[in-house]
């Protein structure tokens, strides 16, 4: 399927990605993004080839005169994976217009888009409005002395129920809930926490993950995985009534020390822009922003 759309000249087209062009596609994707967990072409290519045929068909190439100049992934009312070869930056608006046109033709009303903030001016010019953004932060690992007066131990998989209740309570009223993160039913939460142990967010690293205990009560937890080539802090939370006492810092430093012992030089995490307490903690430990912000934006339905 090829669609000319209502935007731009006939020389620029959106086409479903052909597997034979996957290498060129992901090379273009990497060239236009700085907010990614890795720039390793093979990792991205292997992840794509591991998708189901239906998932692969959601990837589209923006092609000009037969050359791939942009990438995007289209859902029924969603745009993601948006990237433009920097040498074709003037075509960004045309590619986006064609994507919106294609989704509108398919019946989409409101459209949600995910992209790096370098593309935000173009999205905003077409009516997309930022909902929230997240940024990737990284820090070098280092060994530190274990905290005094705080019991840390690796969580066990049979603690999923206890950890689930802990995370539900810790995230109640959190800034991210207004954006649809860290919400859901008890079953959804159990599935999410259990999925971290099972590898849904990368290989779970039990020896770099900890719970902080006061007696039998969990007052803090950090869960670390190995995702896209680097250790990732998948979750870090502290009980509401125990915040400001250094528990989050102790958990993070314990994990970083264990990773250093595993010869992992760096660790990454993602934080929502505006979550200043978390961001300030991470910066004080040595984390710095890497790449641009990953933005989630929304285009309301026509006539709204």
Q: For the regions a protein language model found, what residue spans apply to each?
A:
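Conserved active-site alpha-helix within GNAT-family acetyltransferase domains
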Residues: 116-133, 249, 274-291, 299
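Conserved hydrophobic beta-strand within the GNAT/NAT acetyltransferase core sheet
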Residues: 110-114, 233, 267-271
